[in-house]
Amino acid sequence: MTLSFFDQFMSPTYLGIPLIAVALTLPWILFPTPSARWLNNRLITLQGWFINRFTQQLLLPLNLGGHKWAALLTSLMLFLITLNMLGLLPYTFTPTTQLSLNMGLAVPLWLATVIIGMRNQPTAALGHLLPEGTPVPLIPVLIIIETISLFIRPALGVRLTANLTAGHQLIATAAFVLLPMMPTVAILTSIVLFLLTLLEIAVAMIQAYVFVLLLSLYLQENV
């Protein structure tokens, strides 16, 4: 059977059970449970430092109303980073390369920010559809454009899918070219493959941060 490069992004099944469900539960198993002790091991200390720094950066531009989302956004950030990093291991499946998963996260959270804005401050939320000082003849056109841009915002899930898929495809292509080459050339290609892997690690972390950062910016407009 001939396999294509995109077969690695298909969700595998075992006994009729989609393994994407198993993969989604793995990050919560890997993270250690924080304890009430003053002194912990290095992993828990590093985890607490990272969560503290990220929460400070995330809540800095938000008012008190947006601070209620701190636990949700921080958990989402850790969840996405863990899934992205685990997907870089050999013979593993990356759930965040599935558009259904990313849009399933992006659309409800974006819709929640819009509903909060319409409920708490409907005038300000609707005011975002029309920039201040717009000439009267351009008002209908700008309202249509701003409405379209509002409904395009859940495309942040597409960004996450596209970046991770492109990175995995690049590594798979480089590895496929590496196999039939002579040892001398293969050494150079191995260096390129190693650099691509480092780049993909950075992309996996950055894309998770950008996903949550954009959600916090959408929240900032509506609280």
Swiss-Prot record:
Gene3D superfamilies (alphabetical): ATP synthase, F0 complex, subunit A (1.20.120.220)
Annotated GO biological process: proton motive force-driven ATP synthesis; proton transmembrane transport
Keyword set, alphabetical order: ATP synthesis, CF(0), Hydrogen ion transport, Ion transport, Membrane, Mitochondrion, Mitochondrion inner membrane, Transmembrane, Transmembrane helix, Transport
Reactions catalysed, as given in the entry: H(+)(in) = H(+)(out)
A GO-annotated cellular component: proton-transporting ATP synthase complex
CDD domains per UniProt: ATP-synt_Fo_a_6
Pfam families noted in UniProt: ATP-synt_A (PF00119)
Record's subcellular location: Mitochondrion inner membrane
Membrane disposition: Multi-pass membrane protein
PROSITE patterns in UniProt: ATPASE_A (PS00449)
Molecular function terms from GO: proton channel activity; proton-transporting ATP synthase activity, rotational mechanism
Source taxon at top rank: Eukaryota
TM annotation in the entry: 12-32, 69-89, 98-118, 132-152, 165-185, 197-219
Sequence similarity: Belongs to the ATPase A chain family.
Assembly notes: Component of the ATP synthase complex composed at least of ATP5F1A/subunit alpha, ATP5F1B/subunit beta, ATP5MC1/subunit c (homooctomer), MT-ATP6/subunit a, MT-ATP8/subunit 8, ATP5ME/subunit e, ATP5MF/subunit f, ATP5MG/subunit g, ATP5MK/subunit k, ATP5MJ/subunit j, ATP5F1C/subunit gamma, ATP5F1D/subunit delta, ATP5F1E/subunit epsilon, ATP5PF/subunit F6, ATP5PB/subunit b, ATP5PD/subunit d, ATP5PO/subunit OSCP.
Function per UniProt: Subunit a, of the mitochondrial membrane ATP synthase complex (F(1)F(0) ATP synthase or Complex V) that produces ATP from ADP in the presence of a proton gradient across the membrane which is generated by electron transport complexes of the respiratory chain. ATP synthase complex consist of a soluble F(1) head domain - the catalytic core - and a membrane F(1) domain - the membrane proton channel. These two domains are linked by a central stalk rotating inside the F(1) region and a stationary peripheral stalk.
The protein's name: ATP synthase F(0) complex subunit a
Organism name: Oncorhynchus mykiss (Rainbow trout)
Gene that this sequence comes from: mt-atp6
